[in-house]
């Protein structure tokens, strides 16, 4: 099986994150499963609707290309799921997303769940996702920390910044 993993960052911009992501996913993949990682350039470093649109547009194109290149599935590794429905409509292979899958998985463990996002500007998009996925009665709260995506990525290579993120989260 060959899976196309679409990240909304790239290896050059976030080597610590990229390395950990690859190690984690490859260690959990079934035998004979190949995961091919693809980033976006420029990566999603600032929380804004236009950045999400731009990255989503590239993700849609990559989903189409993955289907044409013989991949068995496409995994969108971005919680905001930008371009998810369009990628599903346009691609010839199954498209699964981090945000939708995480919310549905969370709902298996609790009647009500919440979302903690990294930046308040993501809240309207997450509210839209929750409604679109039919989970408005189950996702009862969306709270935000105060980080830009680039800061979170940098925390994978900076112990002090990682501690700031952990302190904000708790």
Where are these regions (language model features)?
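A short, Lys/Arg-enriched amphipathic alpha-helix followed by its capping loop at the start of a domain
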Residues: 20-33
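Gly/Ser/Thr-rich loops at beta-strand to alpha-helix junctions
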Residues: 10-12, 77-83, 118-122
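N-terminal beta-loop-helix "entrance" segment that forms/cooperates
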Residues: 36-58, 150-157
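Active-site rim beta-loop-alpha module in soluble metabolic enzymes
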Residues: 130-170
